[in-house]
């Protein structure tokens, strides 16, 4: 049984958007293949939320900036003794390739946005019970198509996100690996520190404590308050050890 729970908290708007996109893309593949109405609604709801997130900001622009920033950071390690130079060079080339693919890709989400079935389902998702067969006969007949035909269409939809997915995965992996976990101690359920221009907080907490963190702040300063899962009987120890990485 897992004894540590990892919590992640964004310290700026771009990281908040990236984590939401990562979560939604992961959710797209959870219930594949789509074999019934429930699985279809799970998939289309996540597609719809993804498109909503895409429409709120300059996702491509921010990712390109970060890909270039990560290249500059890696270039400072070239020639440093004791550093795996082949690994550094490989990462730089991967980042350059991701930039090239992302620049040449169509507008993020445009392929999904223009799909007729996705558009029809999106219109009904906000209506309680609005995806019944009499509301969406198009979805009803789609669910009765051969499984291979549905699978092929779903794969095409997901593949249209590959330029974004690959760039985002690389960026988030590098950010998450940019800082080690260090042991910290909260006093009376409270901890605060300087963020040091971090984008992301990562916090490991023992499951035995049955506590969760409420985090507030921004890249220069943040505060963590630990709360009991059982609000009536749970207790927060005077001193609580946890692991924290400011990435």
From Swiss-Prot:
Function: Cell division factor that enhances FtsZ-ring assembly. Directly interacts with FtsZ and promotes bundling of FtsZ protofilaments, with a reduction in FtsZ GTPase activity.
Protein name: Cell division protein ZapD
Any one GO CC term of the record: cytoplasm
Homology family: Belongs to the ZapD family.
Coarse class of the protein's main subcellular location: cytoplasm
A Pfam family of this chain: ZapD
Domain of life from the UniProt record: Bacteria
InterPro entries: ZapD, ZapD_C, ZapD_sf
PANTHER family linked to this entry: CELL DIVISION PROTEIN ZAPD (PTHR39455:SF1)
Places the protein is found: Cytoplasm
Organism name: Shigella flexneri
Keywords (A to Z) from UniProt: Cell cycle, Cell division, Cytoplasm, Septation
Subunit field text: Interacts with FtsZ.
GO BP term, example: FtsZ-dependent cytokinesis
Keyword Cell division: yes
Keyword Cell cycle: yes
Upper taxonomic lineage: Bacteria, Pseudomonadati, Pseudomonadota, Gammaproteobacteria, Enterobacterales
């Amino acid at each position: 049984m897992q004894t540590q729970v990892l919590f992640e908290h964004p310290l700026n708007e771009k990281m908040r958007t990236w984590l939401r996109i990562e979560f939604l893309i992961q959710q797209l593949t959870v219930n594949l293949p789509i074999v019934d109405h429930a699985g279809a609604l799970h998939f289309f709801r996540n597609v719809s939320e993804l498109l909503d997130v895409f429409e709120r900001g300059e996702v491509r622009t921010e990712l390109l900036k970060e890909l270039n920033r990560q290249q500059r950071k890696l270039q400072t390690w070239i020639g440093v003794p004791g550093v795996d130079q082949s690994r550094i060079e490989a990462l730089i080339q991967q980042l350059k390739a991701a930039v090239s693919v992302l620049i040449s890709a169509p507008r993020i989400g445009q392929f999904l946005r223009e799909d007729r079935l996705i558009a029809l389902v999106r219109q009904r998702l906000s209506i309680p019970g609005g995806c019944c067969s009499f509301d969406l006969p198009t979805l009803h007949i789609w669910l009765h198509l051969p499984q291979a035909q549905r699978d092929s269409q779903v794969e095409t939809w997901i593949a249209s996100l590959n330029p974004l997915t690959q760039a985002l995965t690389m960026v988030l992996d590098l950010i998450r690996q940019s800082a080690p976990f260090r042991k910290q101690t909260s006093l009376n359920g409270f901890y605060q520190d300087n963020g040091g221009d971090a984008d992301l907080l990562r916090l490991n907490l023992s499951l035995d404590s049955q506590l969760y963190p409420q985090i507030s702040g921004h890249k220069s300063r943040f505060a963590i308050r630990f709360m009991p899962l059982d609000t009536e009987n749970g207790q927060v120890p005077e001193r609580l050890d946890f692991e924290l990485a400011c990435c």
